[in-house]
């Protein structure tokens, strides 16, 4: 959902990712459904597909970008499912587990674990501090680590 916490999380994630790689935002710049497009204030190494997208070719352009990517990192949903089908690793985040069918998530894990290429992992953003503990004792994407002043 569009919340201040989620916008802050995405900003910190973009800052972290763009330290080492270029990021292509899959925002179509079109309002076709109930999804909102992030307008990041992070510009370094962030690229947009908006100028390439029309209502007719939107999904085709997104599919081609994902197919050529080394990884998909984004919100949990349709595009996070598409990435493993294209042989691309997918890391998806969600913040409201009541906002979707857990059965679909469990099924996705079972189906995508059988693929020879690509992978799928979906994480609740609330679990990131625990993941960070296991990954070296530092909270992942904490405001301090990302150099972001949350005040």
Question: What is each residue range found by the language model?
Answer:
Residues 67-73:
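Acidic donor-binding loop of glycosyltransferase active sites
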Residues 20-21, 69, 87:
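Short, well-ordered alpha-helix to beta-strand connector turns
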Residues 80-151:
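Nucleotide-sugar donor-binding patch of glycosyltransferase catalytic domains
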Residues 62:
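Acidic, amphipathic alpha-helical patches
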Residues 7-59:
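Catalytic donor nucleotide-activated moiety binding site of glycosyltransferases and closely related
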Residues 25-29, 74, 92-94:
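Short beta-strand/turn micro-motifs composed of small residues
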Residues 1-4:
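Secretory-pathway luminal glycosyltransferase catalytic domains
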Residues 31, 78-79:
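Alpha-helix capping/helix-boundary segments
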